[in-house]
Design a protein with these regions (language model features):
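Short alpha-helix in the Rossmann-fold core of NAD(P)-dependent oxidoreductases
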Residues: 98-105, 112
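Short mixed-charge
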Residues: 22-42
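Short, well-ordered alpha-helix to beta-strand connector turns
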Residues: 36, 55-56, 76
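Short loop/helix-cap segments at secondary-structure boundaries that form the rim of catalytic
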Residues: 47-54
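Conserved cofactor-binding/catalytic machinery of classical short-chain dehydrogenase/reductase
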Residues: 65, 104-107
């Protein structure tokens, strides 16, 4: 199973990635357990203390860039969308908040459709 975590180098993204690595498999109702083969951590920056595991792939880029989103979603089985500009930053830079929080989400959903 290949997993994409947008906002993957943020606090929650790193915690989620580590938990998934610890689990090693995911099981969905009515299906056999599936091994986690790759976790793509996608964010605007590399971040610190990213889990070190050969199954981790770190990709930096803009969540609102169609080419980047097409590349990181290619072959993905599961997506956790955590990328966001938090409230105070979005209020300080409204255009950035709209670009990431709205347009980035819309692009991701459209690409996955």
């Amino acid at each position: 199973m290949r997993i994409l975590i947008t906002g993957g180098t943020g606090f929650i993204g790193k915690q989620l990635a580590q938990r998934l690595l610890d689990l090693n498999t995911l099981t969905f109702e009515g299906q056999a357990p599936r091994a986690i083969e790759r976790i793509v951590l996608f964010d605007t920056f590399a971040g610190e203390d990213v889990p070190t595991d050969p199954r981790i792939e770190l990709v930096t880029g803009d969540v609102a860039d169609p080419e980047v989103i097409a590349r990181v979603t290619d072959g993905v089985d599961l997506v956790w969308h955590l990328a966001a500009v938090v409230s105070s930053a979005a209020e300080a830079d409204f255009d950035l908040g709209m670009q990431v929080n709205l347009h980035g989400l819309m692009l991701l959903l459209e690409t996955l459709r």
